Structures are given as C-alpha cells and as structure tokens.
C-alpha cells in the first residue's frame, strides 16, 4: 500500500524538516518488507481568502484534487480519535490487508479542516489532546509511520 502525506503550508528548512526526512527515509527503507511504500509529501500553500470558511473550503478542494481515486483518507484533527502506536500500526496493516492501494494522511491549515472532509474521511485521528504546531505534527506523524512499520515487522525499535 502506498502512503502519502498531504499538508497545508510549506515546511521551512530546519531541524523539524530534517527529522521528517529522516523518519520518512527510514519508513521508505523498512516499509517494503511489510507491504508499505512511502510516496510523497504533497505540500500546498495556504489559501489567501479573506475568511476562514472560504480558506478551509479552498484547501479541502486542493486535498481532494490530489487524492488518488479510492484512496483511504485519514485526517489529523485535535478532535479525532487517539490511538496508541500499536493501534495505529494495526489500522495501517488492516487497510493494507483489505487490499487498499493508496492511503493519504492529511494535515489541515491553521484554520483547521473543512466539514466536507470529515464526510469523505475513512478515519479522523489526533496526536493527543494538546494542540501542536504544524511542523511538529509532521515530525510526529513521520515518526509514527516509521514506528508502525517496525511494529508490523517485529523490529525492536518499538519497546513497551
């Protein structure tokens, strides 16, 4: 199954970008052993519309346009369901085992996600009850993708 990230906003050079690249590289190297492949980070610029609702709608349209047909869509949202790392790995493995070919994890813009995306989403997850800056969300989800691969493969990276 091919996995990609969609993010509103561009990650500037710095330690966060370096960490994201490091974890996604590890994911790419280890994922093929468990049937997972990393495709890309699709970054789109934030909408310049004058109000939040229009910005969210425009950003949602960009996300939907970038989705492959039949792609599983996982939204990251502070009101989503909290999973531990093993449950996240099981979720990804389950989609893979169902024969899903594409999965996209979406990180919304500063205003959040448009309501239309929740209807389209297969799952809405959170990274805890706290609000995180977007650059750290990318780092956290990249690490969790790598951790999921190590859990699915039985690698000792994930120790409880």
From Swiss-Prot:
InterPro entries registered for this protein in UniProt: Alpha/beta_knot_MTases, RlmH-like, tRNA_m1G_MTases_N
Annotated CDD domains: RlmH-like
Places the protein is found: Cytoplasm
Binding residue positions for S-adenosyl-L-methionine: 76, 108, 127-132
Chief location: cytoplasm
GO cellular component annotations of the record: cytoplasm
Annotated signal peptide: none
GO molecular function ontology, one term from the record: rRNA (pseudouridine-N3-)-methyltransferase activity
The entry's keywords: Cytoplasm, Methyltransferase, rRNA processing, S-adenosyl-L-methionine, Transferase
Reactions accelerated catalytically: pseudouridine(1915) in 23S rRNA + S-adenosyl-L-methionine = N(3)-methylpseudouridine(1915) in 23S rRNA + S-adenosyl-L-homocysteine + H(+)
Enzyme Commission number(s) from the entry: 2.1.1.177
SUBUNIT field: Homodimer.
Protein role: Specifically methylates the pseudouridine at position 1915 (m3Psi1915) in 23S rRNA.
Family that this chain belongs to: Belongs to the RNA methyltransferase RlmH family.
Name used for this protein in its record: Ribosomal RNA large subunit methyltransferase H
Species of the source: Rhizobium etli (strain ATCC 51251 / DSM 11541 / JCM 21823 / NBRC 15573 / CFN 42)
């Amino acid at each position: 199954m091919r996995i990609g990230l969609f993010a509103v906003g561009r990650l500037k050079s710095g330690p966060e970008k370096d960490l994201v690249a490091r974890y996604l590289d590890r994911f790419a190297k280890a994922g093929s052993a468990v049937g997972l492949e990393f495709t890309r980070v699709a970054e789109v610029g934030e909408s310049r519309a004058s109000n939040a609702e229009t910005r969210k709608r425009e950003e949602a349209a960009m996300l939907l346009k970038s989705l492959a047909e039949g792609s599983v869509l996982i939204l990251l949202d502070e009101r989503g369901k909290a999973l531990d790392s093993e449950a996240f790995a099981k979720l990804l493995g389950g989609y893979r085992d169902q024969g899903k070919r594409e999965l996209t994890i979406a990180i919304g813009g500063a205003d959040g996600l448009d309501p239309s995306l929740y209807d389209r989403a297969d799952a809405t997850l959170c990274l805890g009850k706290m609000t995180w800056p977007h650059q750290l969300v990318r780092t956290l989800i990249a690490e969790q993708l790598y951790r999921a691969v190590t859990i699915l493969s039985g690698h000792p990276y994930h120790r409880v």
